[in-house]
Every structure is written in structure tokens, then in C-alpha cells.
């Protein structure tokens, strides 16, 4: 039962109605018997109005998605080192009106991969795309044994700023980061030959933006024991993953990343762990973390 003592958490984004986050977090609150509820706030308010509302309404913590992951960065009181390097936030904790923000996307991705494929090691990784989610995955990669990342980035308005941010991540972590033009198929074929993992971090393959981010003929250059991952979780099997599976590669969709980043946000707010296996089982119809 919701009362005046119930702590409020939520997702702030637009659009947001489709989100699985309320199910995940409310399951977590039930697990630890915490008097709290997680709601969805589909908002197009200004960033300043968002931070003001969090403080004024006493919302204990929020997740952020588009369009707020970058625009709220300068408006919070504290940033974790991860958030500073990535330049984007997905989690805010409100402690008596003081907002501390972090980014759990990258660690969420690698945690999901570890759970689904515990014996695998990833020294060299190729990533398609260099948006906020990709930067988070790259920033976290070194903590999971990755030594080199090759990023394929379109030459658009964000190119220079992304290059600068990747240089900062490399300097801070020691991770070797190579950036290539997205449409350079020779460079892509070369990178794939040495990749333990190929990741799609573009929006190509989402329900609203169907397609395949990789020319099908290039997949042959990827070693047969490599893993192919997609950050997209809707649909669960993108054209990219279907192509990889047909070529007998192990695959990983973005659902695990969604669950694990949520669990890390939950811990950031509550200092309690979320049991993720029941959530995996519910959302996959009884299957495990893979």
C-alpha cells in the first residue's frame, strides 16, 4: 500500500511508456521489503525543470533516458568518475536535495555478458556506433579485461567531441582505443579479424529503425568463436543478431544490459542488491541470463 511514507523513484524520459524499468525496480523493492514505488514520468520538460521537480517533490532517485542523459549533466551537484568520463548519466540519487549522478550502462552491459558467458574473455572488441551507450560500454570495458577497442563512428556533427571524450577515457583507463570511419569496410574487415566481441551500439535494428548495421558479407571476417552482441532489447532478435546466429556465432541481446544496469542503479540508491535471476526468468519466459 502506498502511503505518505512511501519512497518514490522513477524513470524520466520521452517516450517512456514502453519501459520495463517499473517491473524491474518494483520487483527489487518487493524483494527487500522496502516501502518504495517506481513510476514512469514521460516528460518533455526542460532539464532545469526536471532537476527542480526531483528536489521539490522529494523523489529519492531517478533513471534517465533520452533526451536527458547529457542535458542534465551540468545541473546535478555531484558526478561519479564514470559519469564524468562518459559525459552522460542514467541514474540520479537525491539525498536531502543534493543530486549525485552516475552511469550504470557500461557496467550493466559487461555484467550481463559475464553472467551469460562466464568462461569468455574479451581482449579485443569492435563497436559499431559511438553514442552515449557506446561510450559507457567503452569506459567500463577495461574493468572486465578488455585491452583494445576499435570504434566505428560516423563523420557527423558529434565526431570531434566524441574523439576528445574517447581520448580522455583512454588516458584515464589505459585502454587502447582506435577510431575508424563507420563506412570504411576495409578497416572494419581488419578489425573484425582480431575481435573477440562485436557490438552493435547503433539504433539500427530497433523496431522504429529496422535494418542491419553491418554489411552481411563482412561478418565472415569475425573469428568463429567470437561473440556478437546488440545493445537493443526490442526486438529481442534484431536482423544483426539473426544474421550472426545463422552464421553460428553466439549472440547476446540488450535485455541483460537493461536488467543489470537497473540492478546497479538500485544498489546506488538503496545500498542493497537486487536478485536479478527471477527478473531474467520472468522476462525471458523461464530462460537464464543469456
UniProtKB/Swiss-Prot annotation:
It catalyses: shikimate + NADP(+) = 3-dehydroshikimate + NADPH + H(+). The keyword Cell cycle does not apply. Keywords: Amino-acid biosynthesis, Aromatic amino acid biosynthesis, NADP, Oxidoreductase. InterPro entries: Aminoacid_DH-like_N_sf (IPR046346), NAD(P)-bd_dom_sf (IPR036291), SDH_C (IPR041121), Shikimate_DH (IPR011342), Shikimate_DH-bd_N (IPR013708), Shikimate_DH_fam (IPR022893). Pathway: Metabolic intermediate biosynthesis; chorismate biosynthesis; chorismate from D-erythrose 4-phosphate and phosphoenolpyruvate: step 4/7. NADP(+) binds at residues 129-133, 231, 254. One of its GO terms (biological process) is chorismate biosynthetic process. It is an enzyme of class 1 (oxidoreductase). It comes from the Bacteria. Shikimate binds at residues 19-21, 65, 90, 105, 233. Its EC number is 1.1.1.25. One of its GO terms (molecular function) is shikimate 3-dehydrogenase (NADP+) activity. HAMAP family: Shikimate_DH_AroE (MF_00222). Belongs to the shikimate dehydrogenase family. Homodimer. Involved in the biosynthesis of the chorismate, which leads to the biosynthesis of aromatic amino acids. Catalyzes the reversible NADPH linked reduction of 3-dehydroshikimate (DHSA) to yield shikimate (SA). NCBIfam families: aroE (TIGR00507). This is Shikimate dehydrogenase (NADP(+)). It comes from Latilactobacillus sakei subsp. sakei (strain 23K). The gene is aroE.
